[in-house]
Amino acid sequence: MGLFSKRQIGNQYETLAKQYLQRQGLRFLDQNYLTKFGEIDLIFQQDETIVFVEVKYRKNDHFGSAAEMVTNAKMRKLIKTAQVWLSQQRTMNTIDYRFDVIAIHDSGRDINWIQNAISEG
């Protein structure tokens, strides 16, 4: 598989995404939140909104962009996992939240922040 494991590479790009969002003024809350439904890479707060972030990386876009890697099944898992996180915070019905994607290309030189990338509908 190469010098680094898939998890190590994922951690590297999640760190890059985390730093990017912090530079944009978002407040970091949690990372790699895991439930039986799935995992959320990053959780931030922007003003009064909780932001659940899926980080995707692609070396190139020959087979589609990083953002296109978020499948319907992955979206459902993210939504269920976010609902668990919100219920544990006791804020599920009282706070706004959204799902964003950070799409990273070209070894981190190209970072695309897609807000409201995933909807519950």
Curated annotation (Swiss-Prot):
It comes from the Bacteria. InterPro entries: Restrct_endonuc-II-like, tRNA_endonuc-like_dom_sf, UPF0102_YraN-like. One of its GO terms (molecular function) is nucleic acid binding. Belongs to the UPF0102 family. This is UPF0102 protein VP0448. It comes from Vibrio parahaemolyticus serotype O3:K6 (strain RIMD 2210633).
